[in-house]
Amino acid sequence: MATLKGQNFRIAIEGTGGDFYVVAMSTGCTVTLNNNTEEGTHKDVVGLANQPVVVSKSWSLQADSLNVVDAGALLTAIKSMEPLAVMFDETSTTDNFSTEHADFARKGQAYFSDLTLTFNDRENSAKTIQMTGVGPLSTVAIGDTFNGPASLAYTKGQFVRLFLSSDNTVAPSSVVGAAKQMSMHVSVSLEDATTKDTDGEWQIMEPTALSYDISTTALIRSDDTITSAVTAKGVADLETIYNNGTPVKWKIANTSGANNRTASSTIVSGSAILQTLTLNGPNRQNADYTANLLGFGAYSVGS
């Protein structure tokens, strides 16, 4: 019997109409099944060795992908804090998405618990999604199938940029100049809601809060600007925002034009506090700074 190759072990998420769609342009996935244990030793047990007892079961999954075209849909889904149906299965080697209904294939309900979007200079943009199961996993049926991925293009990180304002009253129109890296991380806090009324061993989780942060790293220019013609935020501007200690407006947008500084379609926007500003001066390397912004209130998806 041949060994299953990783490209033929895939995760699919419920989409429009209740159909399952594989995570497009996936580079890896992980499913974790966990027995939650409690120490069961007591004074009647002879010796010093532990004797754990299983008290509940839980599961989670993670998928990594080079596709960020669906960033808006994912940002909307995690913001809704509603569970979605997910499924994992072996897929056919002829197309890498037709389900084989393997013995280990399972489906269940899960919350989006973590989403990271990464847009780095001269790299393919990427995402990582994590989902936390709600209740049991069940075996898949013959009628459970995956829909194949759409034909999608890579998104280069240099064409997606962070724009900032100087306060929370005006639109963010100034790009972060000389940027090298940028990412957005969204997290949903989940709390154990399993009670004595819950049937079976599977843990029940419910969302309690949503938080997000944005991180960007940029080079420090010796004159603090790129050129006099560039409207961009430099390290001195970020220090002013830090000193003010009040929210500013931000947006992550696709860009075009000279030096990739003209915003076109907005992916996501909102307000944030500049939480930390770190300046780095390594020997024989370019000096840079990293700004971490903590989300203030809800974000908005799209323009």
Report each predicted region and the residues it spans.
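Charged, amphipathic alpha-helical segments and their flanking helix caps
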Residues: 1-4, 89-93, 100, 141-169, ...
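Solvent-exposed edge beta-strands and adjacent loop segments
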Residues: 1-68, 104-143, 151-222, 266-290
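Short, acidic/charged, Gly/Pro-enriched secondary-structure junctions
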Residues: 68-113, 228-268
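Short loop/beta submotifs within extracellular cysteine-rich repeat domains
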Residues: 136-138, 298-301
